[in-house]
Amino acid sequence: MPIRITGKNLSREGDASATQVQQDLERPTAIQIFAQVAKNARQELRRPARSLAVSGFAGGVTMGLTGLATAIARAELGTSGLAHFITTLLYPIGFIAVILGRAQLFTENTLYPIALVLSERRHYWATLRLWSIVLVCNCLGTLAFAALAVRTDALQPKYVDSLAVIGTEIANHSLSTIFWSAIIGGWIIALVAWLVSGSHSISGSMLLIWLLAFVVGLGHFAHCVASSGEVLSAVLHHQLPVSSYFRWLWPAVLGNIVGGVGLVTLLEYGQTAEE
């Protein structure tokens, strides 16, 4: 049976299209963003452990792009102030690939499931399950990246040396410096997750990720996944003992949790809890 196209049908379609365009142009409210965050959290908490593990591993490997790009740029450009600025422009590459590719990143999960826990007062064990699987698999993914970079002929020796030097510099900070800088790093990346949840476009999301992750790199703020590849590269390159990795990792993880949960999730929940 042929479909009749009438002026009324076209009018309705035009009105619907105009409404959708208007919604896309409007800035989402905090409540709308929180609803999207909660929706994302429910989806992640329901995923099978194997799916989370593979996604977390992929996220760790992909995050190696950040260390790879900065190490190559540093080897080619040197360590002057201008060279450092240019090198840092490449720092967000790993974050862009992981977040837009929807791989699991531990610091994003300081926002999504915690927001749902605060809202519904449940999902505690599911959140701990998600955290443990993703963190372990993120770290295993960064180890795989480090092994590929250091233990094969994939990279020129000067790039491997640059990667190991960066990792050594990261790991040799004091515990207090690692912890407090990780709070800022966790705050910024959880804020990225919040803002991307309210973005209507891929290009807008990419710009948000790039701008905020650039600040993380420029300020040398600790990130438990982004910097793991460099630190593990230094370990595999025999510049650091294995114990140095774990000495660096625990304050970085703790600081990222405090920054993500305390400075983003709790505050964003607080502004929407009574509405």
Q: What is each stretch, according to the model?
A:
Residues 2-275:
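Alpha-helical transmembrane segments and their helix-helix packing motifs
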